Design a protein with these regions (language model features):
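Amphipathic alpha-helical interaction modules
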Residues: 20-72
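Residue-identity detector for glutamine
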Residues: 7-10, 34, 59, 79
Length: 94
């Protein structure tokens, strides 16, 4: 059975939430939780070509471009670059 793009994105989003909630030591406060889930989902979807590619920050994380990652990250995302990198290498293609 083949999943639609929206179903694939929802699968990735659930994997990202599971990773944040159960598989990583970084505590994401409620105030940042939705942002981190959305950016993490965009990173994984961009990596696997699901839907449309993410913006400049997401592209720089996926492309392993450290300087661009830090220069395009806002204050919130800068705190979670380590988490995003761990997601990138530990969340499989849905």
């Amino acid at each position: 059975m083949e999943f639609s793009v929206s179903q694939q994105i929802e699968l990735v989003k659930n994997e990202v939430k599971d990773f944040i909630n159960h598989k990583h030591l970084t505590v994401v406060p409620k105030v940042h939780y939705e942002t981190v889930v959305n950016i993490g989902t965009s990173i994984i979807c961009t990596k696997y070509g699901i839907g449309y590619p993410g913006g400049s920050f997401v592209q720089s994380v996926v492309n392993n471009d450290l300087m661009r990652t830090f220069s395009t990250a806002d204050a919130t995302n800068r705190q979670y670059i380590d988490l995003y990198c761990k997601m990138l290498y530990n969340i499989p293609n849905p």
